[in-house]
C-alpha cells in the first residue's frame, strides 16, 4: 500500500510544473508562428511600377554614378569608386573593379570600354580600360591620346536622334522649412528635349538623379541615389533629406521612340 501511495505521489507531484512548462511551450510556439507569418521584408512598391524596372545595389553611399550596356545581356554600373556588372538582369551583381577614383561615365570606342574621371556635365579623361565589356579592367589603354583626348560623355543628357534627347532637370529649392526657415532640396525630374523645347516626363520616383543613358533599343537608364526626400527623426534630431546606402538604376520597360 505504501508503495502504491508513493507511486501516486510520484505521478501527481510533477503535474502542476508540467502544466506550467506546457503553457510556456505553447506561448513560445504561438510567438514563433506569429513571427513567421509576418513578411520578413517590406515590399518595395517601386518594383511594381508598370513603366519602369528598378534594380538596386545595397551598401553604396553615393548611388549610381555611371551606366553602360543593356539589361538583356551585360549591364555595367559604377557606384562612384566601384564597378559592378550583372548578366542576369540584376538578380545578382559582381564587383569587377575598385578603382579608388570616382567614375562619372563610361564610353565605348571600337570594342574598348573606358571609365572616365571628370565629374563635369561632360565627362572626359579615360583612366580605366576594358576589352571584355567590363569583366576585367586595366590602367593601360589600347589607343593613344589622339583618341582619348576626344572622349566626351554628357552624363546629364542622352541624345537618341539629331532632334531628340532626354535630360535630368534639377529642381530649385523653393519649399521653405517652416521650423528652420531654410530651403529644402527637391527631387530631380526628367525632360524630353526637341526643337519645340523641353517637356517634363511623368517620372514617378522622387530621387536625386546622377546619370542618364539609353541602350541600342532606346530604353532609358537612370542612375540614382537612395536618398528619400522626407524627414527622418532620431531623438531630438531632424534630418532632411533622408540618406540610404543604396545605388539605384531605373530602366524604362518600353523603348522611347525617336520622332
Predicted regions and their residues:
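C-terminal motif of bacterial Sec signal peptides marking the signal peptidase cleavage site
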Residues: 27-30
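Extracellular glycan-interacting surfaces
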Residues: 32-259
Amino acid at each position: 500500500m505504501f508503495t502504491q501511495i508513493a507511486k501516486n505521489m510520484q505521478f501527481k507531484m510533477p503535474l502542476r510544473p508540467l502544466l506550467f512548462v506546457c503553457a510556456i511551450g505553447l506561448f513560445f510556439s504561438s510567438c514563433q508562428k506569429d513571427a513567421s507569418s509576418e513578411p520578413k521584408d517590406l515590399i518595395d512598391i517601386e518594383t511594381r511600377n508598370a513603366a519602369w524596372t528598378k534594380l538596386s545595389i545595397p551598401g553604396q553611399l553615393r548611388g549610381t554614378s555611371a551606366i553602360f550596356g543593356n539589361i538583356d545581356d551585360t549591364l555595367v554600373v559604377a557606384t562612384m569608386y566601384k564597378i559592378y556588372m550583372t548578366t542576369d538582369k540584376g538578380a545578382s551583381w559582381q564587383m569587377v573593379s575598385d578603382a579608388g577614383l570616382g567614375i562619372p561615365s563610361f564610353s565605348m570606342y571600337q570594342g574598348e570600354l573606358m571609365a572616365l574621371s571628370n565629374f563635369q556635365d561632360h565627362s572626359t579623361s579615360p583612366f580605366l580600360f576594358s576589352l571584355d565589356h567590363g569583366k576585367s579592367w586595366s590602367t593601360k589603354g589600347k589607343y593613344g591620346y589622339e583618341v582619348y583626348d576626344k572622349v566626351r560623355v554628357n552624363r546629364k543628357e542622352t541624345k537618341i536622334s539629331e532632334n531628340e534627347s532626354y535630360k535630368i532637370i534639377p529642381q530649385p529649392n523653393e519649399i521653405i522649412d517652416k521650423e528652420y526657415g531654410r530651403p529644402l532640396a527637391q527631387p530631380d525630374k526628367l525632360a524630353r528635349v526637341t526643337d519645340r523645347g523641353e517637356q517634363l516626363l511623368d517620372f514617378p520616383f522622387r530621387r536625386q538623379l546622377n546619370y542618364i543613358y539609353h541602350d541600342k533599343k532606346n530604353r532609358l537608364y537612370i542612375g540614382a541615389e537612395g536618398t528619400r526626400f522626407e524627414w527622418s527623426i532620431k531623438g531630438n534630431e531632424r534630418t532632411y533629406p533622408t540618406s540610404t546606402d543604396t545605388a539605384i538604376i531605373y530602366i524604362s520597360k518600353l523603348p522611347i521612340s525617336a520622332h
